[in-house]
């Protein structure tokens, strides 16, 4: 509906303005690791909505609504792939649940962000997504770089699982440009697709073998971004390698980020 369209396009534009230095708020992506229960997700969304409204002058808050999980080997791949979590793989049901949940969250007035993993599923949900991510395990993938170049929302690309920046920087450079590849249209036909390139891309520091949220790591990242002549906006993921997968460790990570920002670092524009 018009209300959802206004929310999504308005939030995308605000994120774009923020990425290009025209909005001085901090961009915050917050929410569960992945969605497994829509009812719990709506309960969470209602609580987050109050925070979203209270701090909207200083923070641009969107809800993390991840339906797909990249696996290092095997495991549950997320709500879209296996919505009943019983290895029945009712993907059609998963797509319907995911889309309905995104609509319900948007109707509350809360924008949503997600990770794009499967190259086909974005056709079913992207119109309700305000921001997207390419994860550490797929940052080097040509398919995902091409996908990012054609998505109509801002995209963050994570550093590699080992902590290296190269995959993310190369990915951003690739996503900035136009690509031609085979893909599915909205009518589910296979066709040659040509993308325009996505200039609303940025790096996400998620740590690796060691954290990379500290001041030295951030400065090293900024230097690398400048040398690559790409967007110098930095988002920091307080989880994953930066918290060594200990959720309570996210608090001192965020405190460090806040200290860096208050100390004058205006390249840190976002946190997860």
Regions found by a protein language model. Name each.
Residues 41-50, 245-272:
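A short alpha/beta connector and helix-capping loop motif
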Residues 218-222, 226:
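Glycoside hydrolase catalytic-domain groove-lining segments
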Residues 38-50, 73-80:
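Glycine-rich loop at the start of a catalytic domain that most often binds anionic cofactors/ligands
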Residues 1-19:
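N- or domain-start disorder-to-order transition segments that initiate the globular core
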Residues 19-22, 49-56, 100-109, 193-195, ...:
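Acidic (Asp/Glu)-rich catalytic clusters
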Residues 23-29:
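Short, contiguous, helix-prone interaction/anchoring segments in small proteins
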Residues 58-213, 217-218, 240-241, 245, ...:
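Active-site-facing alpha/beta catalytic cores
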Residues 31, 236:
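Conserved, mostly hydrophobic/aromatic
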């Amino acid at each position: 509906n018009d209300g959802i369209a206004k929310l999504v396009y308005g939030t995308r534009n605000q994120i774009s303005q923020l990425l290009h230095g025209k909005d001085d708020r901090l961009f915050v992506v917050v929410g569960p690791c992945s969605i497994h229960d829509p009812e719990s997700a709506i309960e969470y969304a209602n609580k987050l909505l109050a925070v979203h409204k209270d701090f909207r002058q200083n923070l641009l808050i969107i809800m993390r609504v991840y339906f797909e999980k990249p696996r290092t080997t095997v495991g549950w791949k997320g709500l879209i792939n296996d919505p009943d979590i019983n290895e029945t793989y009712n993907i059609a049901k998963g797509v319907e649940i995911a889309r309905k949940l995104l609509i319900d969250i948007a109707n509350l007035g809360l924008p949503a962000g997600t990770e794009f993993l499967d190259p086909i599923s974005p056709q079913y949900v992207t119109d309700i997504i305000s921001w997207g991510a390419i994860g550490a395990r797929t940052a080097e993938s040509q398919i995902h770089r091409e996908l990012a170049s054609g998505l109509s929302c801002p995209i963050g690309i994570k550093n590699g699982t080992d902590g290296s920046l190269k995959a993310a920087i190369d990915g951003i450079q690739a996503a900035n440009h136009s690509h031609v590849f085979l893909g599915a249209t909205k009518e589910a036909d296979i066709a040659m697709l040509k993308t325009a390139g996505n200039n609303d891309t940025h790096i996400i520091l998620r740590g690796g073998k060691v954290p990379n949220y500290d001041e030295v790591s951030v400065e090293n990242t900024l230097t690398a971004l400048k040398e690559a002549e790409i967007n110098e906006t930095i988002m920091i993921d307080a989880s994953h390698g930066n918290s060594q997968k200990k959720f309570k460790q996210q608090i001192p990570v965020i405190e460090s980020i806040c200290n860096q920002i208050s100390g004058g670092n205006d390249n840190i524009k976002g946190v997860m």
